Amino acid sequence: MAPWPELGDAQPNPDKYLEGAAGQQPTAPDKSKETNKTDNTEAPVTKIELLPSYSTATLIDEPTEVDDPWNLPTLQDSGIKWSERDTKGKILCFFQGIGRLILLLGFLYFFVCSLDILSSAFQLVGGKMAGQFFSNSSIMSNPLLGLVIGVLVTVLVQSSSTSTSIVVSMVSSSLLTVRAAIPIIMGANIGTSITNTIVALMQVGDRSEFRRAFAGATVHDFFNWLSVLVLLPVEVATHYLEIITQLIVESFHFKNGEDAPDLLKVITKPFTKLIVQLDKKVISQIAMNDEKAKNKSLVKIWCKTFTNKTQINVTVPSTANCTSPSLCWTDGIQNWTMKNVTYKENIAKCQHIFVNFHLPDLAVGTILLILSLLVLCGCLIMIVKILGSVLKGQVATVIKKTINTDFPFPFAWLTGYLAILVGAGMTFIVQSSSVFTSALTPLIGIGVITIERAYPLTLGSNIGTTTTAILAALASPGNALRSSLQIALCHFFFNISGILLWYPIPFTRLPIRMAKGLGNISAKYRWFAVFYLIIFFFLIPLTVFGLSLAGWRVLVGVGVPVVFIIILVLCLRLLQSRCPRVLPKKLQNWNFLPLWMRSLKPWDAVVSKFTGCFQMRCCCCCRVCCRACCLLCDCPKCCRCSKCCEDLEEAQEGQDVPVKAPETFDNITISREAQGEVPASDSKTECTAL
C-alpha cells in the first residue's frame, strides 16, 4: 500500500482517527518529527490526515431544511439607500414616492368602483332570477332551503345588503316571518364571501402569493360555513336568535332616524352612477309577486319623475261598483263614477352610459361583468406591483412588525380582539365587508399580513357589516322599522356567536388550518381553486335546493348517507394522524383506495390534457386569456406551448432529488471532485504531486 500523501501547511488533528496497519493508530507523529528534523526552514511544516478511501463508498444524504411556505417573505430593498443619494436623487426619490402614493390611491379607487359595478352586473344578469327564488314563500318555511336560497341569491347579486333588504321588505309586508328569514340571513353571510375569493384568483401567477392570498380569502368562507353548520341546527331547535332579538326590540322604543351615513359611497357614487344606475326596487317587487315588475328593466332610465293624483270619470258595470253613492250616476245605458288615478310623469333622464341603448338586462349585465372583471384584475395587479415596490427593506419590516406583532405579556391575548375592532371599524367606514376583505387579500398575498392576523380582521368585517345594517334599519319607515331592526340584530348576534365558537380558544380556530390546507392544494393544483368555487357556491347549494323541492324524504335519503360517509372519512383521517396503531394495518393509510380516489394527480392529468389544446390559442389572444389559461392548466409560462408544464414538473423533480453535500464525503479528494475544483482524471496526479 502506498504511503499517505503529506500536505504542507496542515496541522494534525488529534480528534481525528488516523488509519494505520491492522486498524491501529499510525505513527504519524513520529513521521512528523522526522520530517521536521530534515526540514531546513524554520517555519513549521504540518500535515493533514486523510480518511480511508473505502469510506467514500457510503455517501450520506445531508438533511435539507424545508422552508415553511407560510412564513412571510423578506422583501429585499435593492435600491440605493437614502444616505447614499445626493440632493438631486433625494428630491427625485421624494417625488417618486408621492407619485406612487397617488397611483396607489387611484388604483384602489377604481378597484372599489369595479367591485360596485361588478355587483350591479350580477344583479342585471341574475337579479330577476334571485327575486323569483323569494316569490314562493311557501317553500321558505324549510330552514335548509332558506339557507340555500340565501347563498344563491347573494352569489347572484354579489351583495348581502341587497338580499337582506329583500328579506326585510318581505317581512315588513308579512310575506315572510322572522323565523323563516333567519336561515336566509345565514346564507347571505356565506354568499358574500365569494367576492374576495374571486379577487384571490387574480394572484394566480405566483405560486407562493397565490397560496397565501387564496388561504386568506377562504378563511372567511370556512368561518361562515362552520358557523352555519353549528348554529343553524341550534337555531332550529331553540330559536335563540329570534327570542333574543325580539326581547331587545320590545325593550327599547326605537324611533325613526335619518338615513344611514354614506362614507365611501360619497366618493365612489359620482363615478359609478355615470356607468350604470339600477332600479333595485324591481327585485323586491318580483319577490313580492308583483306581475308588472317582471316586465320592467333593472336599468334605470328616468331619474326625475312627477307623480300626480287626479279624479276621472269611468264607467262601471253597475251602481254597486261605484266608489261612492254620491259619485255615481247613470247616463243612458252606462253607469258612471269618479275614480282617483295616479299619473307618473317622466321629467328628466338619468345620466349614464346605457340610458339610451335600450339593451336587455342580460346584455348590459354581460358587458359590465366582463369590463368590471378586467378593471378589477388590472387594478389588483397594479396595486400588488406598487405595494411590492414600496414595501421593501426597512419600510416592510416596520409595517409587518406593527401589524403582526402581539402585545407584550400578559396582554398578548388582547391583540386579536383589537384586530377584530379594527376590522369592524374599517368595514363600517367602507360600508361593505366585501370591499374590506377584497382589499385585504392582496396584502396577504404579498406577505405583509399573516393569515393569523387576517383572521380576526375578517371576523371584525363580519361585525362591521351588521352595524351598517342596524343603522340602515333605524332609518327605515315606521311599518318596516321593527322587522328590519330585528333581522339586522339577528345577523349581528349570529356573527357574535360564530366568533365565540371559532376564535377565543386557539385550538378552535379551525378556519385557519382548513384555509391553509386548501391554500397548499390550490397552490399545487391551481385549477382546484375554480373547482372549489363551483362546488361550494353553486353545485352544493343547487343540489340541496333540488333535493329540498323533491321532498324531505328524498333529502334525508340522499343527505344522510353522504353526511355519514363524510363523518366516517374525517374520523378515519383523524385516527390515521393521531393514533394509527388502533387501526388495522390496511386502514392506516389510503393506499387501499384507487389512485384517483386518494390523489389529485390523475385529475390534474385530465385537466391538463383538456386545457392543452386551448392553451396556445388562449395565450395568443390576450394577456387576460393567458392568465385564465395559467389558472386552468397550472402553467406560469403560458405563452409557450403546453410542454412548458412538463418542463416545469421535470425541473421541480430535479430539485427535489437530495444532493450529496461536499462536506459529507470522507475523502477530501473526492470532496473536491464533487465541488468541481479538481477533474476526476487529475485526482491521482494531484495526490502524487502532493
Curated annotation (Swiss-Prot):
Site positions per UniProt: Breakpoint for translocation to form a SLC34A2-ROS1 fusion protein: 126-127
Induction comment: Down-regulated by EGF.
Compartments in which it is found: Apical cell membrane
Chief place where the protein resides: membrane
Pfam families for the chain: Na_Pi_cotrans
GO MF annotation, one: phosphate ion binding
Residues in compartment: Cytoplasmic: 1-100, 157-212, 384-407, 507-525, 574-689
Name this protein carries in UniProt: Sodium-dependent phosphate transport protein 2B
Role, per record: Involved in actively transporting phosphate into cells via Na(+) cotransport.
Associated disease: Pulmonary alveolar microlithiasis: Rare disease characterized by the deposition of calcium phosphate microliths throughout the lungs. Most patients are asymptomatic for several years or even for decades and generally, the diagnosis is incidental to clinical investigations unrelated to the disease. Cases with early-onset or rapid progression are rare. A 'sandstorm-appearing' chest roentgenogram is a typical diagnostic finding.
Topological domains, Extracellular: 122-135, 234-362, 429-485, 547-552
Similarity field: Belongs to the SLC34A transporter family.
Domain of life: Eukaryota
The encoding gene: SLC34A2
